[in-house]
């Protein structure tokens, strides 16, 4: 049985997090992620659409591999990655646990799969969070499209308004639970987010909705899963993932 850490690096389209179009063959954007996963002796897979064969060969090793994908521009990269993960995981066997993360602003601080909190909770979803509540100005704007598409979205926002804002830049769990969550997340995007023409991707909105309405009873977020978001706690080693 294996544990996996997956990430996706799609270039050639506007990156909403960096406010720019990323260079096609720039390994330095994923280098820290790859090195941190390899240092923990975990299997990491980087899905990409534009790395050269030369760079893939140069930076592949015992732990890190590259998988070329065809990007479908019908969905923003922040959303399309979930379809990539779903389709990849559906084809492989002997997977015990999975985390999926952002790739350019996340590094692994320690192996999450051997932590007592993880091993004792095979039916839990683990994810990042932010030091703010779900009810905030950015999320209200971010969720405009989903709010108009999903009948119960506004009620969910009201119910969980004062709860911590979850961050989909880091999430994972034991495989059966994780894959169930991932399939439901993809279904939400395919059903409600395919016609999104707003300036927001909907990835955070769909993730928080699903985690809170269907997985909230078995949800772990914050320490030790992640450092404080955007606190740039680069020296912390007591959490599983550093996220900015």
Predicted regions and their residues:
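PAPS-dependent sulfotransferase catalytic domain
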Residues: 125-170, 204
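Short catalytic/ligand-binding loop motif for oxyanion handling, primarily in non-cytosolic enzymes
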Residues: 14-16, 53-57, 106-110, 115-117, ...
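Short, surface-exposed amphipathic charged segments that create phosphate/polyanion-binding patches used
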Residues: 79-88, 139-145, 235-243
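N-terminal anchoring/stem segment of glycosyltransferases
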Residues: 1-80, 84-95, 176, 215
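GT-A fold catalytic core of metal-dependent nucleotide-sugar glycosyltransferases
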Residues: 82-140
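A short acidic, often aromatic-flanked loop/helix-cap motif at beta-alpha or helix-coil junctions
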Residues: 71-78, 133-135, 225-231
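Catalytic core and acceptor-binding pocket of nucleotide-sugar-dependent glycosyltransferases
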Residues: 154-244
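A structural signal for short, well-ordered beta-strand segments and their strand-loop junctions
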Residues: 7, 45-48, 97-102, 125-128, ...
């Amino acid at each position: 049985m294996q544990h996996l850490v997956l990430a996706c690096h799609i270039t050639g389209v506007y990156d909403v997090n960096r406010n720019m179009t990323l260079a096609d063959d720039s390994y330095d954007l994923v280098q820290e992620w790859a090195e941190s996963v390899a240092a923990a002796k975990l299997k990491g897979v980087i899905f990409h659409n534009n790395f050269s064969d030369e760079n893939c060969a140069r930076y592949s090793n015992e732990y890190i591999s590259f998988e070329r994908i065809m990007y479908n521009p019908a969905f923003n990269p922040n959303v399309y990655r979930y379809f990539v993960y779903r389709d990849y995981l559906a084809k492989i066997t002997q997977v015990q646990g999975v985390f999926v993360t952002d790739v350019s602003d996340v590094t692994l601080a320690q192996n999450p799969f051997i932590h007592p909190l993880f091993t004792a909770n095979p039916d839990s979803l683990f994810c990042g969070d932010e030091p703010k509540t779900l009810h905030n100005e950015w999320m209200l704007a971010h969720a405009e499209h989903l709010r108009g598409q999903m009948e119960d979205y506004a009620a969910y926002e009201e119910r969980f308004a004062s709860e911590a804002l979850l961050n989909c830049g880091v999430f994972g769990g034991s495989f059966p639970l994780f894959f169930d969550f991932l399939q439901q997340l993809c279904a939400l995007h395919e059903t409600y987010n395919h016609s999104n023409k707003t300036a927001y991707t909907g990835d955070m909105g769909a993730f928080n909705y699903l985690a809170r309405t269907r997985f909230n009873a078995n949800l772990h977020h914050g320490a030790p899963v992640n450092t404080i978001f955007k606190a740039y706690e680069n020296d912390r080693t007591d959490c599983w993932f550093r996220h900015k």
